[in-house]
Amino acid sequence: MNRSPSSSGLLPLPGAPSSSWALYRARLSSLLQSVDTAVFIAFWLFGLINNVLYVIILSAAQDLVGNGIPKGVVLLADVMPSFLTKLVAPYFIHRIPYATRIFIFVTLSSAGMLLIAFTPPSRSVAVKLIGVVLSSISSGGGELSFLGLTHYYGHMSLAAWGSGTGGAGLIGSLLYVMLTDWIGLSVKTSLLASAFLPIIMLVSFFLILPHGPLRASARKTYEPIANRDSFQEESEGAENNFDDIPTSTASSSLLAPGPAVAATAYSSHPTEDARKDSLAAKIQRSKSLFFPYMLPLLLVYIAEYTINQGVSPTLLFPLESSPFAEFRSFYPFYGFLYQVGVFISRSSIAFIRIHHLYLPSLLQVANLVLLTLHALLNFIPSVYIVFVIIFWEGLLGGCVYVNTFAEIMEHVPAEDREFSLGATSVSDSGGICVASFLSMAMEIWLCNWQVDHGRDWCRRIKAG
């Protein structure tokens, strides 16, 4: 069933018949008054910490592998494990309690960053990539878990998560530039400091996030359901048993599910036949998600990460006409500008909604074509114009990401929503996987083209 913006907790799209400044002021006031501060902070920190190491690793890609290896190699190691995790985990991860998942994610991500930091330059790049893989598995499992968790805390938790992921990009890229370029710390020291960031997820889950809905739903045990009538009886009984679920805004408004939904989601293990039926139903639901939600998210990620890892390392200008003292500074600064755009657009979901997801996706493809042509033909006269394009790229990418999941929360039935949110998240990792292969080929091709045509700047880059 379709939901209007006002009924879903979102502000209407500017220019829509239902929009007006009075409605905006009233809706904004309502949103601010209804926000459960603890829920918002917890999900913002989830989004921030789950994604910040991923961003730091990509920002450090040039320093990890040097200029002799395509940066797409780091991107592939940073996203392929995450992609595989999100591809298979939605079908079994619901059997693992959220508290256990948090400990697993923190252990994997911290161990990965420590391995990267302590691997000496004399050792093979492959050893560092193992650490990248560990962090990637943690990030993938964390994303689908926290997106699924937003189902129980409503639209504002999704807005907080989206803003946190955008903040991760901004803070991660800025932090790496600040530590290595501005403060002058070594790459090892910078990466070592970041290894302790995942501890914040433990604080967020166990000390900040209200656990009322989760504790209440966990008390409900599963009983086999014989037919539809008995299912309805169980649902009614579940609602009666869940009267003690807190009625704060986190659990009762902004698309929070009913008690029966929580009982079903947190019930104990079903029979074998029910498992088979559930798996078949989930596969069928995944197919129905592809064209309206998965494909536009896939397209935008293919385009933007091909730009970030395959094209931007070759978007170089003479140092005297740029704000940089060395060529290695272009790449991380492009990443920072991109993340600024992502943060702004992912944080705007409560105020601006985009329902036509394919439009920004196709605009992102146009960005890829434009910047690739410049890398070949060198027709953009100033690096500052490229700065604007990269910032616009970030706006488009963040817009598609957060609006895709907002559309799911509005249009997918409540009983399917938790699975749909997690399953759709495979598209961003899938798109990045495709982009990693494209970018490895494109960076080498574009750099060779530039050298052959008298621009050898890409060969002058020295790793930090």
From Swiss-Prot:
> Principal localization?
membrane
Record flagged with keyword Transmembrane helix: yes
Q: Name one GO biological process term.
A: lysine transport
Q: Does the keyword Transmembrane apply?
A: yes
Q: Which UniProt keywords apply?
A: Amino-acid transport, Membrane, Signal, Transmembrane, Transmembrane helix, Transport, Vacuole
Name of this chain's protein: Protein btn-1
What protein family does this chain belong to? Answer: Belongs to the battenin family.
Q: How does it sit in the membrane?
A: Multi-pass membrane protein
**Signal peptide start and end residues:** 1-22
Mind telling me which Pfam families this protein's record contains? CLN3
Task: Spell out where the chain crosses the membrane.
Answer: 38-58, 73-93, 102-122, 129-149, 167-187, 190-210, 288-308, 332-352, 354-374, 376-396
Task: Tell me, in a sentence or two, what this protein's role is.
Answer: Involved in vacuolar transport and vacuole pH homeostasis. Also required for cytokinesis.
- According to its UniProt entry, this protein's organism is Neurospora crassa (strain ATCC 24698 / 74-OR23-1A / CBS 708.71 / DSM 1257 / FGSC 987)
Q: Spell out the subcellular localization from the entry.
A: Vacuole membrane
Gene Ontology CC entries for this record: fungal-type vacuole; vacuolar membrane; vacuole
- Report the InterPro entries cross-referenced here: Battenin_disease_Cln3, Battenin_disease_Cln3_subgr, MFS_trans_sf
